């Protein structure tokens, strides 16, 4: 009889053992992200990541400067946390998101953004929307970063911005890496994304750049119209007469006389800001604004610009001041600047398209033309990018 009773007993014991191990494994899996859940609640869920990798884009959008660092949901999620984490500054007061606010198309309304210990940025903070969709791979106004990956950790190491400069007694980036390594939620996030807890500058760059490249806006009035026509030059059926006029003025090159005065054609904006991405031409010189934001002298090296998409917010107002100095606050003033270019002494890098026949261009604009271009620029504003939670601050 013993063999008969022994087998069921062993069988039941085996089942209980397996079930016990299974429960232990499940509990371990749940507890492995306890720090993430404690810090972020439902805003970051490793089991249900936001969609960054396959958002899609219109068929007419062809430019892409990703260059091998393709977006994944996991790395972009980690990039989002890094982007908004004030722990990335020396005194835990400033994050990337402090100077690039979602409600302003990831730009800033301040002329110079506030850094650590009352430091100020040397140039106005550039909007980040659609940074991926450009032939220009370099970043910063002066293009000093060869890639977005390189750009992402330079503000962290800037003495005035986030402070890990290694200058005047300040800590270096290696101190930050150790600091992050000791935060429980980063231990879990890096383990989740990379399979280990090692934190390096290249990993910060990889994740931050993926998050920034994921920020896209293609639900504007312009996009609705562009999807209905075969070519950019055709009238958009959803545009007003004024908006279509402004589009034509934007796209058409101007005709100049020998003195550089416009006698016909459009404004030629698309020569540097080509549709449909409205990104900056990589071969562009500066635009004639050569002042410094908070220092004397001139700076002729600002040849980069953000996309003109979402230049204006959903309220019809600019998403902060324009140009590297932040010195232009209205679309009227921006168009006025290009309407009459002054050839300043020492500006050897002025874009040649702005000095026809050796003269600073005079577009000879009338108010109807200005109003039409303004109306067109406002059609480039999307909506979802301002409120989509996958780009929002996960710490709030």
Regions found by a protein language model. Give the residues of each.
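Glycine/proline-centered hinge or cleavage motifs at structural transition points of membrane proteins
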Residues: 138-181
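C-terminal motif of bacterial Sec signal peptides marking the signal peptidase cleavage site
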Residues: 18-22
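C-terminal capping alpha-helices of c-type cytochrome domains
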Residues: 173-192, 196-219, 327-396
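Bacterial N-terminal signal peptides that target proteins for export
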Residues: 1-10
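Short glycine/threonine-rich turn/loop motifs
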Residues: 26-154, 223-339, 343-347, 388-396
């Amino acid at each position: 009889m013993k063999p008969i009773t022994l087998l069921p007993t062993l069988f039941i014991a085996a089942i209980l053992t397996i079930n016990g191990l299974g429960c232990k494994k499940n509990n371990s899996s749940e507890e492995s992200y306890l720090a993430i859940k404690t810090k972020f609640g439902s805003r970051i869920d490793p089991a249900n990541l936001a969609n960054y990798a396959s958002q899609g884009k219109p068929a007419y959008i062809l430019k892409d400067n990703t260059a091998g660092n393709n977006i994944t949901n996991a790395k972009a999620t980690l990039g989002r946390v890094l982007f908004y984490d004030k722990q990335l500054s020396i005194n835990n007061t400033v994050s990337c998101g402090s100077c690039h606010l979602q409600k302003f198309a990831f730009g800033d309304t301040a002329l110079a953004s506030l850094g650590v210990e009352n430091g100020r940025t040397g140039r106005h903070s550039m909007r980040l929307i659609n940074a991926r969709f450009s032939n220009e791979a370099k970043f910063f106004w002066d293009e000093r970063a060869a890639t977005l990956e390189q750009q992402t950790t330079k503000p962290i190491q800037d003495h005035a911005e986030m402070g890990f400069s290694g200058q005047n007694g300040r800590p270096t980036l290696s101190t930050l890496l150790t600091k992050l390594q000791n935060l429980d939620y980063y231990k879990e996030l890096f383990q989740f994304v990379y399979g280990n807890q090692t934190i390096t500058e290249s990993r910060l760059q990889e994740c931050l750049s993926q998050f920034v490249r994921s920020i896209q806006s293609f639900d504007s009035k312009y996009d609705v119209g562009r999807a209905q026509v075969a070519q950019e030059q055709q009238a958009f059926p959803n545009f007003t007469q004024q908006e279509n006029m402004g589009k034509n003025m934007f796209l058409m090159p101007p005709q100049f006389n020998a003195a550089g005065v416009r006698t016909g054609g459009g404004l030629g904006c698309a020569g540097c800001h080509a549709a449909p991405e409205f990104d900056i031409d990589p071969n562009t010189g500066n635009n004639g604004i050569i002042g410094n934001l908070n220092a004397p002298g001139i700076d002729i090296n600002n040849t980069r610009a953000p996309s003109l998409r979402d230049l204006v917010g959903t309220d019809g107002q600019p998403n902060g001041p324009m140009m590297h100095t932040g010195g232009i606050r209205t679309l009227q003033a921006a168009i006025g600047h290009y309407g009459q270019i002054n050839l300043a002494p020492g500006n050897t890098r002025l874009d040649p398209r702005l000095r026809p026949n050796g003269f600073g261009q005079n577009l000879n604009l009338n108010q109807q033309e200005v109003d039409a271009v303004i109306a067109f620029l406002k059609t480039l504003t999307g909506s979802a990018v301002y409120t989509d939670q996958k780009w929002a601050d996960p710490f709030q």
